[in-house]
Regions:
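Catalytic histidine-centered segment of alpha/beta-hydrolase-like enzymes
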Residues: 181, 206-222
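Alpha/beta-hydrolase-fold enzymes
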Residues: 13-14, 27-135
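Gly/Ala-rich beta-loop-alpha elbow adjacent to hydrolase catalytic centers
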Residues: 19-24, 28
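Catalytic histidine neighborhood in serine/cysteine hydrolases
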Residues: 192-211
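Short beta-strand immediately N-terminal to the catalytic nucleophile in serine-hydrolase-like folds
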Residues: 18-20, 45, 174
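Short beta-strand/loop motif that positions the catalytic acidic residue
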Residues: 167, 173-175, 179
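Conserved alpha/beta-hydrolase "acid-adjacent" motif
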Residues: 180-186
């Protein structure tokens, strides 16, 4: 996956800004540490980076469950982890209207035609699950959740161990205050692992759960525009010193 990303970055000119949500966040951080000269700015939202820094429902489950259980999930899917099976496992398929209303942060009242339309769109999206390759899934469970290899510097990417301290690009960390999957501390620990100067690190904690980071009305209307403005600001590292 990192190899393909690297090919794409080269096709785009060799330097990019990266925005990584959830699992895409730790992958983006790995890329930025593996190829630090190719990432100008980095945004991580709801991304599990240092599992030992805090506990979430997901990391607690991964820690308490034997690896054989996850291998069994892959076997049941004939080499894949079936999205609808995992959804049932989490119980997220039973979201009621109040939970959806809270997640979307919409002003439309429950029972109104406008909310009914939003709810139908959400349920259609929510029912469209994605199957994951078993090899990838097991690697995430074992290396990220069981051994915390990203934070400890043991993760091997494209033949080399990843040293997060080599990543010195400006970084924005966005956490969900009530995240059931990624504890805010698991994300915010990033600032102590990377080589980015403190003045080039921005952090925000949004009043939502995990999915609200990219679906909540308030978050989309207030937090992401702030991140977008930050991304287009000049990078102070590239500014020439003022003449004496």
């Amino acid at each position: 996956m990192l190899f393909r990303s690297n090919v794409l970055v080269d096709q785009l000119g060799g330097t990019v800004d990266l925005v990584g949500l959830c699992q895409g966040g730790w992958l983006s951080l790995l890329y930025a540490a593996r190829f630090p000269a190719k990432v100008s700015k980095l945004v991580l939202a709801g991304a599990p980076i240092d599992i030992a820094a805090g506990q979430s429902a997901l990391s607690a489950l991964a820690d308490a469950s034997p690896l054989a259980l996850f291998h069994e999930l892959v076997t049941l899917g004939e080499g894949r982890v079936l999205g609808h099976k995992v959804q049932k496992f989490w119980g997220s398929e039973t979201l009621d209207s109040r939970e959806i209303h809270r997640l979307l942060q919409t002003p439309e009242p429950i029972g109104s035609p406008a909310f009914a339309e939003l709810e139908a769109i959400f349920r259609d999206w929510h029912a469209w699950t994605v199957d994951l390759p078993g090899t990838y899934y097991l690697e995430v469970i074992e290396k990220l959740y069981k051994r915390n290899e990203i934070a400890t510097g043991q993760f091997i990417a494209l033949g080399e161990p990843i040293d997060l301290a080599t990543m010195r690009a400006p970084i924005f960390l966005l956490a969900a205050r009530n995240d059931e999957l990624v504890a805010p501390a698991q994300l915010f620990a990033t600032e102590h692992l990377v080589g980015t100067p403190a003045r080039a690190i921005r952090k925000a904690s949004a009043p939502c759960g995990h999915a609200g980071l990219f679906m909540g009305r308030t978050i989309l209307g207030e937090y992401w525009p702030r991140i977008a403005r930050w991304m287009i600001e000049p990078d102070s590292r590239s500014l020439a010193p003022a003449a004496a």
